[in-house]
Each structure stands twice: as structure tokens, then as C-alpha cells.
């Protein structure tokens, strides 16, 4: 990987080691989630998969742990991506695969938690029916259907993911239209990549995938310069020649907006002004001849310094792609709202029934475990969906939009943190699982010290036999 100084010498980028506080917090959450979640989920997989008898409950939580374990495996890539300030060194295959795994885990986890809630509700309301129909085979079939539905819902992530290289810097992006990158996936740190947009350029929010801090990087090599920001892309030639490109907004998990400045380019058709000038060979040529009159029309007056800050967060009219709306609201409704309604309804019915029916202590603990798991899931995922919806409608260039983008790294990290909570909840609240873990650890120690234990065991057995024989003789 190239060093910061090497990148600066080759492209004119000025990288600095400082990170935004929100970025540091997000990396800390991701790191803690990986350190705790990977061994925790691995232990649950080992115990529940190999040491415990197959029941309906173990099937539910075993599949849930598989989803969390796979998500934990992807966290180092996310941490490195944040540390590299948006640079994507892993290639296009992982650009498609890693975000797909994250969304796959999101849908699988929420569907499995919903199934657990429904299962417990049926056990309380319909105990006789459950006794006749509730079995391990049915639970496995339901889990298989859940994985299949989750896979179908994450297909758009895999299909539309692409890598985009700009000045030797590869970025992981979503591309909804041929030849045009609708939004970039990750953000750049303003202090690291550059110092904002040139004064003559008016930048408007665009569409990009991963929402994050307002930042930009700028290169000034050759006859033209490129400024890629969290919200927009603008290509500029020296001497006031400026062309506004299709906007692109760095966002998170499918929240992005497309806003194009409706500027008349003095005779140039409006639709031609919306072409991707980064891929326009004529524009990149230094021999492009533009008349003085056209140059005057192409230049944009410099706005006041606080022009954008004074605008309302909802000032601009956003044009959101239809596919973006489908993806965003599908995740919100199918992956959050409907499951939450089902969970709340199930536990409400359980509470009402428990008022009239006496519940044994073990059932109380199992119910408490499920409720805590669901509550933590909601706490982890609610900020992610709330931030995503707000970013669709709030101008990212406003103070409110900038604040949302700054803290969205934290909301994404918090959503990933849900993967490490479940195994520790099992250990704290599940007595049977704690017992199995102790037995498994004892087995490891016995295998490591098999010779000594064998001798000790033989001695104990011999002593017990002699005592028994002596007792029988005395009688």
C-alpha cells in the first residue's frame, strides 16, 4: 500500500493523520465488536452446534449466531476502510461481497429474531398446537426460507457494486446507470484529502452510498483538476472553464440523492451538461477550444461564504432515483418496521397471557432472554434506519445534513455491534449454555493433561473399589 507521502508526491493530495472524532468512535466500536464478537460467536457455534442436543430453540439461536459470526469476519475490512479514509484496496470482488454480507446479515438477523418471537408467542397462546407441530425439522425449514429471502433482498447490493478509480485512488461505489456512478460508498476526510471546492464552483449534494463526514479531496495535475466530495463531483479547467458533473454523494447503505444545478451553458443543451465529463475524451483534451463568450457563461459567480449554511435543510428539490427509493424503503419496511411491529405484538400478547397463567421460572428466564436480545437489536439498528431516511430528504450541505453525515459512521458501527451482543447475552442469561461451556472447557483441559488425569482417575477408581469391597466385607 502506498504511503501518504507517496500519494502526495504523485497526485498532489495532502494527507494528514488526524481523524474526525466521529470516525475514531466508529473505528473503536468496530474494533471492540470484532474482538468480542468473533470469539464469542465462535464459542456459541461450537457449544450449540456440537455439545448441545438439537432443539427448536438451539436451531433458532444457532442460525442467528452464524449470521453474526459472518458479519464479524467482515469488520476488519470496514475498519481498514475507515482508516484509509475511503480508499478501497481490496478490488471489485470484495467491493461487491463485503457490503452484501453486511446487508445479508441485517436481514437474516431481523428475520430470525422475528421467528423467535413468533415461536415463543405460539408456545404461550397455542401450547397444544405447538406440541403437535413444533419440531426441529420445521424450524430448520423456516431458517432455510429466512436465509433464502435474505439472499434475495441483498442481490441489488451485489449487482450494482463497482469500483471507481480516480487519480489512482480506487473507491467502492454503487452504479445504477451504465457509464455513471450514482454514489460513492465511503467518505473522505476533508483535512486529509484537500481543502474544499474551488471558489468558482458551486457544489450541490449528489448521491453516494456510505454516508459520512463532509469531506473532499482535490487533485491538480495536468490541464484539469478534479474535486470529489461527499456530495458532488466537479471537473474544472484553468482560466474559469468549469463544467458541472452529475452529483455523487458519499452515503451509507443505500441512502443517496441526485441534485443537478439547472444552469444554462449558453447554447449547450441541458442534457449534454449532465453527461459524465470524467469519461469525456473531448473534455479531457487540453486542446478544447471554448470561446470567450462561452467561458463567461460557463463560469459561476462566487457565492457568499455562508450561502449554503443559511439555507434550510430542505431548500433543494431532490430527485431521488426510483431504484434508490425501492432499496431504501424496502430495507426500512421489510428489514425494520414490520419485524418490530410483529415482535412488539408477540410480546404484548405474551404479557397479557402471563397475567392469567402462572409461568414457571425457567420459562420466565427464556422469555427474558428473548426480550433482551430483541431490545438490543432495536437499539442497534434504529439509528441506522433513521439516519438513512433523514439523509434522503435533508440537504447534506446544510448544518443539519453535515451533522447527520458526520455521525452516520457511528450509526453503521452501532448496527454492526449487534453481532457481538447475542453470545454474551446467552452466557449471562442462559444457565444451560453456561453449564455446557464449562463442560467443554473441562474436556479441553482433560485432553491437554490426559496422562495425569488418567492416572488420577485410575487411582480414584481403585480407591473407590477398595472402600466398597471393605464395606461389603464388614457387613
From Swiss-Prot:
Q: List the disulfide bonds.
A: 95-172
Matching entries from SUPFAM superfamilies are given as:
Family A G protein-coupled receptor-like
Broad class of where this protein is predominantly found:
membrane
The subcellular location is: Cell membrane
- Which Pfam family, just one, is annotated for this protein? 7tm_1
The record lists glycosylation at 9, 168, 273, 292
Keyword terms, alphabetized: Cell membrane, Chemotaxis, Disulfide bond, G-protein coupled receptor, Glycoprotein, Membrane, Phosphoprotein, Receptor, Sulfation, Transducer, Transmembrane, Transmembrane helix
Found, by tissue, as follows: Expressed in the heart, kidney, lung, liver, peritoneal macrophages and spleen.
Positions of post-translational Sulfotyrosine modification: 174, 183
Q: Which residues lie on this side of the membrane: Cytoplasmic?
A: 47-57, 119-139, 352-368, 430-475
Ranges facing Extracellular side: 1-23, 81-96, 161-331, 392-408
Any keyword Transmembrane?
yes
Q: Which residues carry this modification: Phosphoserine?
A: 450
Q: TM segments?
A: 24-46, 58-80, 97-118, 140-160, 332-351, 369-391, 409-429
Membrane topology is: Multi-pass membrane protein
Q: Can you name a GO cellular component term?
A: plasma membrane
- Please describe the quaternary structure of this protein: Interacts with VGF-derived peptide TLQP-21.
Q: Which family does it belong to?
A: Belongs to the G-protein coupled receptor 1 family.
Describe its function.
Answer: Receptor for the chemotactic and inflammatory peptide anaphylatoxin C3a. This receptor stimulates chemotaxis, granule enzyme release and superoxide anion production.
Know the name of this protein?
C3a anaphylatoxin chemotactic receptor
